[in-house]
């Protein structure tokens, strides 16, 4: 083999490694879990009134701390609320890509889904205790992805009437848990909380005074 042939083969091998490297890096970046340092929940009364805003934060990002609630959820009884979630990464500048995580989740809706769980019977709608233990259980989602599957950035909740005769034994305090799953290529009509990576898992205290 002459010198020219050797150089030609070496160039071909180097080019193959370069192309292979480019093709394998990008999907990994696309499927990386989201970095979330602050979550804001806004409960807006459907029939008008002052929104209830609570938040959770994780100032060290990928460090040892987890997202922790800063507030307790306190909702009026017998009231319908629209809940919206805002997720941000405060380790990035507001103008940088990767700051507004809720927008990324919306854009990649076919890869993400929020699951909700709560103390049984705190809400008249949805009923039950949420879909963390079973995907088939009821949550009222008001947003969908491109395949018409729920995302969960927007939901609707109606609290029980604590003064009604039929609910006098129902607890008015409990917990409200939100889990965000990252399910690229896995999300479907039955994929539950055990499928995919967990981007977020927070449990708030909740009270109906």
Stretches found by the model and what they are:
Residues 3, 16-41:
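Bacterial Sec-dependent N-terminal signal peptides
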Residues 14-15, 123:
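Exposed boundary/loop context
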Residues 30-209:
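First exposed extracellular module after export/assembly in secreted or surface-exposed proteins
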Residues 1-11:
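Bacterial N-terminal signal peptides that target proteins for export
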